[in-house]
């Protein structure tokens, strides 16, 4: 995998390891088989990593269009029973961090991973895809670090339960 604009290259082996590490991080924050994970990002390296990580553990990747406005984002998150929303800021003239705070004002006061929202009862996590830190959100480095607490056997167990008939992607 090559991202020439970022001077970044992954061999398939390196990508596989990064995906496993990301999958373990997702498991650490409660994502498992059947969990709905929204990814609101354009073509950045960890979009691919998150997509494959979801697929490996049987989570359902929910496509979030980068052109969505506030009402569309809120409808999607509510209607899809989204558990975790992964965001990248600054895509296509939108401020996804601010839109997320508008949708989930509880993020500003809750502990990461313990979101409780009446409007979005399934939503527990928001992950900022990048190194920036935002109140109430994990960032990529923190997710990868949390994954160190997940045993390889747990990842292997979830991977073994994935079936070719499982839903891998939900699109709106």
In which residue ranges do the predicted regions lie?
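Helix N-cap/beta->alpha junction signal
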Residues: 41-43, 89, 166
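Short hydrophobic segments within beta-strands
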Residues: 2, 40, 86-87, 129, ...
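Structural core segment of the AMP-binding/adenylate-forming
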Residues: 29, 57-145
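Conserved S/T- and glycine-rich ATP-binding loop of Class I adenylate-forming
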Residues: 37, 54, 85, 167
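Conserved AMP-binding/adenylate-forming core of the ANL superfamily
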Residues: 1-52, 69-74, 141-148, 159-162
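ATP phosphate-binding P-loop of adenylate-forming
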Residues: 165-172
């Amino acid at each position: 995998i090559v991202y020439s604009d970022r001077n970044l290259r992954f061999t398939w082996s390196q990508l596989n390891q990064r995906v496993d590490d990301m999958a373990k991080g997702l498991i650490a924050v409660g994502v498992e088989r059947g969990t709905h994970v929204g990814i609101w990002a354009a073509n950045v390296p960890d979009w691919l990593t998150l997509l494959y990580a979801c697929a490996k553990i049987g989570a359902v990747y929910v496509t979030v269009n980068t052109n969505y406005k506030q009402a569309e984002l809120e409808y999607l998150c509510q209607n899809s029973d989204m558990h975790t929303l992964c965001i990248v800021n600054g895509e296509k003239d939108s401020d996804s961090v601010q839109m997320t705070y508008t949708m989930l004002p509880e993020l500003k006061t809750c502990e990461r991973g313990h979101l409780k929202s009446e409007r979005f009862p399934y939503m527990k996590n928001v992950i900022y895809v990048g190194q920036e830190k935002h109140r109430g959100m994990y960032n990529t480095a923190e997710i990868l670090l949390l994954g160190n607490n997940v045993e390889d056997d747990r990842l292997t167990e979830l991977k073994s339960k994935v079936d070719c008939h499982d839903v891998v992607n939900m699109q709106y």
